[in-house]
């Protein structure tokens, strides 16, 4: 081989890990009539170019002692054809034969890049991140990252000694995406990106925003995921997915068991570690299914650095947390859930992200994912960055992650956290601390557009059919569950935070004072059909000094559990889908503690087993009685029978389905038994007492009506017929025409 020039300025820039265009000097280039190969391999002793069959094409001369080598290939290649050669590298302790990363052409399709820049989440899913694949028959990993403000980006990892000089990337202008194919590495490699800001300053090593696998915290590297294995995963849930696609979830029985997977089950014999996905599949899935829940909802499982955030401060929205094992483990978990008849909902946080140095903040030296103005880009309550969802690429990145959960892991629902904080520019901000919209208002127009785009995408052809979306929205924003075509946000369901706050406030009152707060239990029906609601008794209500559900109730231990049982009976009969956080189903006394577990030992006590049995029976009856769910979002499905008996703290209402089937719920929220309480009923004859939360099996006194009552033609409460009931203390009864 002949000597080949290597410009001194290029050498200095490459060695300083600040060259803006490494493909302009590295790899094969035509210089006159020769093909010159230049490479940067710090620490290499000798480099030769070899043919595919192993024959030596020639020596690359060391042109700088820091590791720059150059030489010319022999003639024989057609002009314009990519030269075919490999590099044989002698390291101090090994020899490596590998293709030259800088001999490959551009990787990403221009149309896909343009669509990503325009805000297409499918293009983000196709372009960004790390993907093990073959290029021109050569196995390796294609890396791509969006960093338009960077002056140089390198991929670093175990494969190059974390040396930012070794694998600088190509910038695809004007889209701001950097790409590189690294030959002969594959799934399982650890990596990060080394970036320099526009002024040349080196930034902290950054994890891949689109990584599909990560190290387990506190380690922070990204890992090349085996996406081919995920996409070839042996799913056996075709029947489930077909049924989901045709299910009208709004009019189906939905009862959700909310779980913090890091603490639901711990392995005490192994340092109290969290369970893996496979262990949770063996324990959580049969438990939730046996309890009669229709879905499990997982607090955020996208990788998060700080366990105390419960997952709500994620930095890797595409990657299931490595705390629970590899991504394939989560796929197996969902597969087990579907086989057991359980849907899986994941919490998703597009509102904000933490400021860990390896994360998204000032990713390329600029406010890339966040707003530059702290009045828009910093959340004062959570001390986190606010996603700039009005930037097309950021919106595409986030929605692409939601699509990934739906496609790769077959999740059945996505609950969007902190929607209210997105909708209002002045959320948790005093005057002067927020920026009005273009019309001078407080509404966040960019977030509104983003949420509509999210719902249109998840309900459109880009997503698998039947994936439901849920909004945690705590204000009276109109049209959260209205279609986007009707100027709504397009969610399938909204958490009814007002109902939860009002009813828990009522239940906290001593029964003697409840007559003065009667409206707290009835007010929810004023707006119950304005949206499609979920009634949430979530993790947020049993933490930070608020007390567990059982601890919120007044009275002695028996009265507290009786209050809770009566409340559950009221809730499961009330219009709206149901959600209960773990530990609530057996009335644990302690608050949620993310570093502990639910108080499973309480199930040794009959009273707590009784509450657990009640929740199981409520779920099964709720699923079996169409009157309790078929018209959840329609006024025709509900009517008050007794809504004004504040002196006795008694409530009664009827639920109906569109076939005329009925169920009546009667609640006595005082510890005083009511005998001969005459209740108007919408039909004559025998009514079966299908549920009594005071039943002995649930830990109650077993007071009731012997299993049935008789409705005679005695008018009461606006009905032609009525029955004389015995109302047990602090209890709810369900009656159904026999």
Curated annotation (Swiss-Prot):
Swiss-Prot/TrEMBL GO biological process terms: glycogen biosynthetic process
CDD domains tied to this protein: AmyAc_Glg_BE, E_set_GBE_prok_N
Single Gene Ontology MF annotation: 1,4-alpha-glucan branching enzyme activity
SMART domains per UniProt: Aamy
GO cellular component: cytosol
Membership in a protein family: Belongs to the glycosyl hydrolase 13 family. GlgB subfamily.
Name by which UniProt lists this protein: 1,4-alpha-glucan branching enzyme GlgB
């Amino acid at each position: 081989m002949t000597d080949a020039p290597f410009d001194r300025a290029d050498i200095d820039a490459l060695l300083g890990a600040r060259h803006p265009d490494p493909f302009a000097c590295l790899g094969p280039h035509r210089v006159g009539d020769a093909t010159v190969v230049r490479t940067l391999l710090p620490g290499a002793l000798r480099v030769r170019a070899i043919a595919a069959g192993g024959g030596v094409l020639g020596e690359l001369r060391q042109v700088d002692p820091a590791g720059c080598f150059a030489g010319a290939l022999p003639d024989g290649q057609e002009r314009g054809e990519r030269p075919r050669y490999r590099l044989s590298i002698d390291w101090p302790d090994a020899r490596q034969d590998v293709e030259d990363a800088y001999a490959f052409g551009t990787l990403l399709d221009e149309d896909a890049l343009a669509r990503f820049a325009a805000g297409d989440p499918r293009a983000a899913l196709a372009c960004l991140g790390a993907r093990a694949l073959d290029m021109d028959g050569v196995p390796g990993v294609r890396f791509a990252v969006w960093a338009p403000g960077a002056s140089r980006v390198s991929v670093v990892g175990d494969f190059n000694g974390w040396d930012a000089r070794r694998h600088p990337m190509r910038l695809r202008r004007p889209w701001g995406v950097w790409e590189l194919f690294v030959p002969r590495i594959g799934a399982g490699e650890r990596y990060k990106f080394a970036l320099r800001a526009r002024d040349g300053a080196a930034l902290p090593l950054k994890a891949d925003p689109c990584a599909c696998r990560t190290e387990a915290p506190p380690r922070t590297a990204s890992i090349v995921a085996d996406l081919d294995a995920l996409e070839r995963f042996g799913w056996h849930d075709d029947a489930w997915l077909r049924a989901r696609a045709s299910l009208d979830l709004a009019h189906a029985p939905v009862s959700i068991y909310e779980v913090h997977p890091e603490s639901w089950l711990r392995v005490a014999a192994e340092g109290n570690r969290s369970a893996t996905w496979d262990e949770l599949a063996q324990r959580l899935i049969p438990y939730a299914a046996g309890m009669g829940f229709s879905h499990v909802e997982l607090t955020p499982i996208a990788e998060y650095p700080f366990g105390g955030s419960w997952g709500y401060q994620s930095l890797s929205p595409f990657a299931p947390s490595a705390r629970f094992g590899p991504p394939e483990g989560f796929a197996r978990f969902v597969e087990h859930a579907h086989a057991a008849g359980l849907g899986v909902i994941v919490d998703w946080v597009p509102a904000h992200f933490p400021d860990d140095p390896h994360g998204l903040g000032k990713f390329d030296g600029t406010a890339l994912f966040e707003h530059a103005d702290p009045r828009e880009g910093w959340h004062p309550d959570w001390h986190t960055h606010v996603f700039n969802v009005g930037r097309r690429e950021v919106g595409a990145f986030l929605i692409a992650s939601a699509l990934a959960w739906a496609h790769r892991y077959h999740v059945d629902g996505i609950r969007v956290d902190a929607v209210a904080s997105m909708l209002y520019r002045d959320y948790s901000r005093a005057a002067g601390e927020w920026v009005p919209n273009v019309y001078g208002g407080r509404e966040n127009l960019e977030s509104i557009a983003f949420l509509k785009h999210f719902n249109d995408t998840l309900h459109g052809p880009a997503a698998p059919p039947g994936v439901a979306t849920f909004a945690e929205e705590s204000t009276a924003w109109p049209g959260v569950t209205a279609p986007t075509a009707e100027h709504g946000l397009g969610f399938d369901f909204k958490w009814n935070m007002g109902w939860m706050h009002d009813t828990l406030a009522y239940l906290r009152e001593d029964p003697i004072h409840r007559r003065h707060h009667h409206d707290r239990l009835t007010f929810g029906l004023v707006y119950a059909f304005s949206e499609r609601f979920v009634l949430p008794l979530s993790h947020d209500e049993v933490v930070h000094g608020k007390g567990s559900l059982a601890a919120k109730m007044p009275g002695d231990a028996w009265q507290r559990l009786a209050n809770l049982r009566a409340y559950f009976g009221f809730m499961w009969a009330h219009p709206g889908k149901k959600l209960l956080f773990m530990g609530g189903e057996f009335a644990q006394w302690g608050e949620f503690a993310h570093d502990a577990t639910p108080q499973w030992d309480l199930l040794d006590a009959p009273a707590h087993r009784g509450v657990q049995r009640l929740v199981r029976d409520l779920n099964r009856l709720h699923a079996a009685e169409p009157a309790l769910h078929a018209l959840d979002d329609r006024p025709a499905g509900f009517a008050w029978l007794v809504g004004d008996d504040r002196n006795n703290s008694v409530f009664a209402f009827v639920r109906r389905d569109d076939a005329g089937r009925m169920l009546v719920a009667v609640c006595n929220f005082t510890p005083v038994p009511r005998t001969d309480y005459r209740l108007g009923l919408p039909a004559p004859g025998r009514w079966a007492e299908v549920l009594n939360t005071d039943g002995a099996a649930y830990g109650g006194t077993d007071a009731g009506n012997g299993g049935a009552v008789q409705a005679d033609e005695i008018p009461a409460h606006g009905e032609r017929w009525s029955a004389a009931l015995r109302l047990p203390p602090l209890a709810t009864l369900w009656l159904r025409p026999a």
